[in-house]
């Protein structure tokens, strides 16, 4: 009982303290200037609402008198608006007013901490402090020296009692284009006025953190489900973070986290805010999308690109198509796609290589087609080196409801991606602290970034408003992608990147050859995922799991390996090369120049395909071999790999023989009954034949010693097989 009696006064004191704190917070008002609702302003409001700040915005709907908005040089308009707003608060002695910019400011903590730090400053007015003097460097000598901290006044944020702030701005009679910072600086540098109003600077960034001149000092601090900006130089946790001018990009980075928009405990807490759901909307009511396709250089797997475009789960009748093809190499592929599928789209516009339109001009044309059409709701720009493997990609991007958004795309096995997390001082790539985590999926969310490329979705309304008078793809001497991002940033439009889903990947174009008939066959090293999709049978993984492997003869295994495209292109490549052997024993292509069991064939090394074929054997045949012949390990070495051609009037069959291999792979490249009649393989020791080889299926059997075999006669048409003597 005595303990309870002792605790009662303590509880009463805590209750009184809480009431006093609440009363104190009620006497705090945040004033800011925002002439229009930009994305930066909405971010500011969201962080303020998170901490329950009371905000009053000044100047909404008013024209800004200086180009560049409220954060630009000038700023006298802000003083005028503040002076007028303070008229009704001038006699409120208990009212504390925080005045901050809004487009480039976020709150990192709440009113209680703000007011506590303000009271500890023991001043009537506290200004933010900066590393550099601005705008008049001649005034530097007049500034009081400080033993530790930032020396110079910053006008982007200050806090004070209402009567003192009224005195501060009472003398303002300048123009809207005059400098607010110079006005406040001259008052501060006047010792009499500084003492009369009782003005101090937040030298150690306890309240205000100006990022300009302090980028190396500020890091993110993750703590108990919250995120703060920490100043390493002074070991302080600022309440207000301000990133004006060139430091806006760093503020965008910090704003991805502060105050609790992404944490390690919660992940992204705001990714589902403001979504535009497309569920339940009929096809005819879906937004109209203009898809801009850009083929700017020789690109592998263009057929797959168009196939993935067709697979998008979005009605073609709500899509318009604009294609810029700069490459004659792809002219027939583009025309074939449009001939087969162009009528499925609402409209089609093609600019081919004969027009010779520059990359940037073509991209501007695509954006203009949407900008100038009020019915165009979205512009979806996609480069041909994008492998868009998620069929719901377009819907997912639309639902995220951002002005500009890109899906994360990376190159296979590399950190190369379609976004930059930061920019260097000269505007080029710089790796942000979170770049690798975002690329590798350890941090998942929707990220405000300074650079995107290759694929992005833009709202038509943004093209007709914030971006309406912008030559989007020209900027100084920059490439079109960097020009686009620089222009968008300049218009204060945020560019977002989402890695909430696996959308696809980027192709590597570095080593793409155009000297063959079917150049994609050579891409097994550079673009292995796409090579597999195009050339490896869809049921190969089932075969690897043992579900689709047949045994037509003892120790002879039969399983799917190649797609129709792989078979057809390999045959066409060989016929295009055309230098078939004569089918006699003399053969200068092999060591010794003598072939004991000759065929009419072309070796893989004759078409410079030996290295790629070995990669195929290692990646797809070796795993099957090791599964089917337990205890055997192979690196799939070979001396001979070739395509054989059988014709009734040329070489219809092959005599009984042993192969010079530990095991042999024999892949049927065309279809019995359609392309030829007869054919097959007979294993004499077992009196067992495979008479109807399936196109794209491989026969795998031991070579020397046990499996003595012959090629059965082809009686009509032409039969092709791909043969490899592995581990000779």
From Swiss-Prot:
Q: Which InterPro entries match?
A: Collagen_mod_GT25, IPNS-like_FE2OG_OXY, Nucleotide-diphossugar_trans, Oxoglu/Fe-dep_dioxygenase_dom, Pro_4_hyd_alph, Procol_lys_dOase
Gene Ontology CC annotations of this record: catalytic complex; collagen-containing extracellular matrix; rough endoplasmic reticulum membrane
> Glycans attached where?
198, 539, 687
Whether Membrane counts among this entry's keywords is: yes
EC no. given is 1.14.11.4
| Signal sequence bounds | 1-18
Gene3D superfamilies xref list: q2cbj1_9rhob like domain
Q: Which PROSITE patterns match?
A: FE2OG_OXY (PS51471), LYS_HYDROXYLASE (PS01325)
**PANTHER family found in the cross-reference section:** PROCOLLAGEN-LYSINE,2-OXOGLUTARATE 5-DIOXYGENASE 1, PROCOLLAGEN-LYSINE,2-OXOGLUTARATE 5-DIOXYGENASE/GLYCOSYLTRANSFERASE 25 FAMILY MEMBER
- Describe the subunit structure: Homodimer. Identified in a complex with P3H3 and P3H4.
The protein's name is: Procollagen-lysine,2-oxoglutarate 5-dioxygenase 1
Protein source organism: Mus musculus (Mouse)
